[in-house]
């Protein structure tokens, strides 16, 4: 008998078993990959968006070779295609403005376009001629374009020309990829720093500062009816002068401020409320989106909504009642015991974009800005 004969069947059996185990391992890996891929594919991205592929380009244009070696918060290069309304702003360190953010290199120097990780395009500055003012047709691989607007759809032209251009949205709308509201409330870190309201300094009743006067607009029509029953001091073009630097001092003398928006759209709650009214410690009387929309950002007793009244005459009567009833008037300031208002700045908005880009690496395309925004 060949001394190797008895070992041959055992060797074959072990070889077959190893082959079966290898095939089983390959099958498990394949189905695990398939399941993950399906999970991503069957997610529910925001309407109008399409997830294309993850970003595979490292900061400033180089290809990623080893993802494990990439820092958690790489220094990103962000290009501002234009300054907002062509007005330069100071750019402080993002690490000092947004908790958890690392610093980004933010610049308006268009020469860095080929190396930029992202480009922020302010819609107002390109909307009158998008074909001439948009970015070059050749885009560096992985570069993300961010559509930015703080204006309402009523004041944004040629949105349809932007189909397929942008990867992220940035606006006052809470469903934007980068949410940049005009203002917000935040808790006091300790005792409120503001002194109690000095009611004796409120010597006037109702004010309104308006620069864009359109007689056929909803807010002007409402004012025309309201003033028949209540004295309203109007500041701005063709009205009482309001010298630069005196707005807060002037408006703080009033008990109420008409925070009337120039157009009525979801989440469009602007500096008319956050700055003109709340920073002046005046109770805002709002005309804009629904009360429910306001209550997403403010306590229900922090403002008065025109929709709460059947007519401007009824609103006028209510304001006159509050003027005489100090306790009821002061109830509109109770929320300030625990919360304080904050207002946006361009620099803060840019740093929010910086933080978002650090946190979110997926690459998507906004199919239609117009379909989402209007």
UniProtKB/Swiss-Prot annotation:
Per the UniProt entry, the Enzyme Commission number(s) are 2.4.1.152, 2.4.1.65
Keyword list, A-Z: Glycoprotein, Glycosyltransferase, Golgi apparatus, Lipid metabolism, Membrane, Signal-anchor, Transferase, Transmembrane, Transmembrane helix
Q: What is its main location?
A: Golgi
- Which residues are glycosylated according to the annotation? 60, 105, 167, 198
Q: Membrane spanning segments where?
A: 16-34
Q: Does the keyword Signal apply?
A: no
**GO molecular function (one):** 4-galactosyl-N-acetylglucosaminide 3-alpha-L-fucosyltransferase activity
Reading the lineage from the top rank, the first entry is Eukaryota
Positions in the Cytoplasmic compartment: 1-15
EC category: transferase
Xref: PANTHER family: 4-GALACTOSYL-N-ACETYLGLUCOSAMINIDE 3-ALPHA-L-FUCOSYLTRANSFERASE FUT5, ALPHA- 1,3 -FUCOSYLTRANSFERASE
Q: What is this protein called?
A: 4-galactosyl-N-acetylglucosaminide 3-alpha-L-fucosyltransferase FUT5
